[in-house]
């Protein structure tokens, strides 16, 4: 019976396709885990929507994943984590629920040496102040500087990962953070890990915190602690569900995932 519990999938969800960077990190860190991904591609972006709407959409996704008997959930969306994280945890009870903001904040605090942390994220995540709150809960003396970097999202989706336009945009966004003397930078949007090489070069000696990797590490730790790690599965099952299959979805999705997407299925929620 215990083994059946361990074989249950991890549910990962996002408002769109950015959360596939989290799936990729989970596949690498936990290669024996079955994974179900849901991306709400019909209703993306969430960032411009009200708190009530984001909570409502998030609950629909959580219900969908619960129907698929997941053993844990990963909120692979900074907006959902910031706005609806608490409500999701209330709904799921004792089930482990991981999220990119908690994991990113924890890793940033463990990384910084001078107690000055920068965050680049979308407008909604920056305005929610969720990263600063998560960091200050653990260390109120840390200087947290946030910078909205919305233009990087379409550049990543266009595949301009090393383009001069992207480099110049990154430079502009980093300027105020570097001027404040940060030594650690959190990539606070699920699209940004794809720009890690470029951001790393432009940020110099600043340590980069990749929320996808830190969330995968935290997931591994929690599953082990709860006795839910799958240690006997050489042929894991990966399923991808979306609420719409927009133009170029597979191309962009496979870029994020770093591999082909076999099973993509469209479902409508709500």
Curated annotation (Swiss-Prot):
Pfam families: Asp_Glu_race
Membership in a protein family: Belongs to the aspartate/glutamate racemases family.
Entry's Gene Ontology molecular function annotations: glutamate racemase activity
Highest taxon of the lineage: Bacteria
HAMAP family: Glu_racemase
Catalytic reactions on record: L-glutamate = D-glutamate
PROSITE patterns: ASP_GLU_RACEMASE_2 (PS00924)
Gene that encodes it: murI
Chain's role: Provides the (R)-glutamate required for cell wall biosynthesis.
SUPFAM superfamilies noted in UniProt: Aspartate/glutamate racemase
Entry keywords, A to Z: Cell shape, Cell wall biogenesis/degradation, Isomerase, Peptidoglycan synthesis
GO biological process: cell wall organization; peptidoglycan biosynthetic process; regulation of cell shape
EC numbers on record: 5.1.1.3
Official protein name in the record: Glutamate racemase
Binding site for substrate: 14-15, 46-47, 78-79, 190-191
Lineage: Bacteria, Pseudomonadati, Pseudomonadota, Betaproteobacteria, Neisseriales
Active-site residues annotated for this sequence: 77, 189
Pathway where it operates: Cell wall biogenesis; peptidoglycan biosynthesis
């Amino acid at each position: 019976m215990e083994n059946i519990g361990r074989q249950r999938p991890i549910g990962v969800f996002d408002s769109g396709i950015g959360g596939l960077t989290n799936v990729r990190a989970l596949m690498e860190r936990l290669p024996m885990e079955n994974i179900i991904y849901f991306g709400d591609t019909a209703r993306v972006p969430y960032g411009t929507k009200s708190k009530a709407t984001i909570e409502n959409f998030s609950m629909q996704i959580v219900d969908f994943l619960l129907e698929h008997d997941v053993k844990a959930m990963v909120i692979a969306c900074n907006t959902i984590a910031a706005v609806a994280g608490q409500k999701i945890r209330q709904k799921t009870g004792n089930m482990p629920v991981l999220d990119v903001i908690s994991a990113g904040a924890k890793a940033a605090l463990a990384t910084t040496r001078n107690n000055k942390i920068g965050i680049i994220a979308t407008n909604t995540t920056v305005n929610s102040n969720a990263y600063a709150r998560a960091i200050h809960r653990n260390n109120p003396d840390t200087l947290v500087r946030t910078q909205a970097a919305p233009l990087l999202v379409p550049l990543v989706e266009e595949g301009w990962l090393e383009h001069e336009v992207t480099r110049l945009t990154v430079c502009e966004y980093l300027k105020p953070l570097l001027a404040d003397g940060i030594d650690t930078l959190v990539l606070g949007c699920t699209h940004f890990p794809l720009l890690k090489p470029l951001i790393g070069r432009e940020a110099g000696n600043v340590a980069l915190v990749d929320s996808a990797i830190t969330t995968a590490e935290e997931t591994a730790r929690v599953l082990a602690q709860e006795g839910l790690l799958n240690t006997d599965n050489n042929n894991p099952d990966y399923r991808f569900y979306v609420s719409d299959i927009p133009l170029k979805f597979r191309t962009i999705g496979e870029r994020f995932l770093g591999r082909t997407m076999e099973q993509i299925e469209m479902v409508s929620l709500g």
